[in-house]
């Protein structure tokens, strides 16, 4: 294969390291020249040591400050021609939109819709502007990858894409890194919430369910791992912790070990996910997953077979699904864990995602 110059546009080190390092490793192994546009982070050295060139980029991941966004477009307009890539891979809303606007169809850009986040969950001025920007920018996009059918259907229905798209199984899961482990022994049931502490992630439903279940089953333990994103919801977590309903363990770089210690991973998100990586990694480890009925989550969880689904925003229904798990026999719990692993092996192997990107590199 001819050696190519490839530019990645991302909004955080974790975006590439947690979900795309296998792709980057393979591209480096094949001898391609890689440029990574990322915000400053001490961990960027990981990619520098691989031989990638880091382009420090100021990007406000969640803010809606027009001046900062204009500065980002201006930066991309200057930087992209300087790199002069054969192909651009972008992830998340701002790199997708502003990267495509800046390159203006002069460069082949592959946009990955990793999930719409809070942007399109309710109609607002911000969502209307984002939709308009997507309409303008994605027309200039060479290819669009979707991670779930719900996002794809929305973009097609709204006329944001025509036929320049394909489906991916989320970001995929590294099956070697997330090896199958038997469920923990003992009489205690341990449940794990992994995500930012905020309304969108359904933290209030998790707290409600934790209280209901802990009162009925005192041998239950509910853990919360993630950043404090909204202080008002962190106050609810702290109060629940005082009552003994939950334990907050903060953001964990060793989250794999915590998944192994628990029986269930719970994702009560209200929407905007791609295909949730926490569910893929938990299921691959053999953990039962319980999630809300949203796009992406419903692709991972087969209700009653690999886990349970509950009505989005309904803490009482979440508690009912948790109780279903508790009442299973040890053999039934183990079978559900194995079924989850098998589903990830068959449908969400990260090698599928890597191959899709390598195919685009070969064609460019």
What residue ranges belong to the model's regions?
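A conserved mid-protein helix/loop that constitutes part of the nucleotide-sugar donor-binding site
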Residues: 17-22, 189, 193-212, 316
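Nucleotide-activated donor-binding/catalytic signature segment of Leloir-type glycosyltransferases, i.e.
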Residues: 234-252
């Amino acid at each position: 294969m001819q050696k190519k110059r490839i530019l990645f546009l991302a909004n955080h080190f974790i975006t590439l390291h947690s979900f795309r390092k296998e792709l980057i490793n393979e591209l480096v192994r094949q001898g391609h020249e890689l440029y990574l546009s990322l915000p400053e982070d001490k961990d960027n050295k990981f990619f520098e040591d691989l031989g990638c060139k880091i382009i420090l980029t100021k990007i406000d991941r969640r803010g809606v400050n027009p001046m900062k966004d204009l500065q980002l477009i201006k930066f991309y307009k200057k930087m992209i021609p300087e790199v002069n890539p054969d192909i651009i891979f972008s992830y998340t809303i701002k790199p997708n939109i502003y990267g495509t606007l800046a390159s203006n169809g002069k460069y082949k850009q592959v946009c990955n819709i990793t999930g719409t986040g809070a942007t399109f969950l309710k109609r607002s001025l911000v969502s209307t502007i984002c939709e308009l920007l997507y309409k303008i920018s994605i027309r200039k996009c060479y290819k669009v990858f979707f991670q779930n059918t719900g996002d794809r259907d929305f973009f097609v229905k709204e006329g944001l894409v025509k036929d320049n798209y394909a489906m991916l199984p989320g970001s995929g899961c590294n099956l070697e890194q997330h090896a199958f482990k038997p469920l923990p022994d003992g009489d205690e049931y341990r449940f794990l919430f992994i995500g930012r502490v905020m309304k969108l992630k359904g933290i209030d439903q998790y707290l409600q369910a934790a209280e209901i279940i802990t009162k009925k089953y005192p041998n239950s333990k509910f853990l919360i791992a993630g950043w404090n994103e909204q202080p008002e919801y962190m106050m609810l977590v702290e109060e629940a912790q005082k009552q003994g309903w939950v334990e907050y363990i903060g953001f964990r770089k060793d989250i794999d070990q915590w998944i192994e210690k628990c029986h269930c991973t719970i994702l009560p998100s209200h929407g905007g996910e791609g295909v949730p990586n926490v569910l893929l990694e938990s299921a691959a480890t053999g953990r039962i997953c319980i999630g809300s009925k949203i796009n992406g989550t419903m692709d991972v969880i087969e209700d009653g077979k690999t886990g349970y689904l509950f009505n989005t925003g309904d803490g009482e229904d979440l508690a009912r699904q948790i109780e279903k798990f508790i009442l299973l026999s040890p053999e039934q719990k183990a079978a559900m864990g194995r079924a989850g692993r098998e589903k990830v092996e068959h449908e969400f192997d990260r090698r599928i995602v890597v191959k899709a990107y390598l195919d685009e590199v070969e064609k460019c």
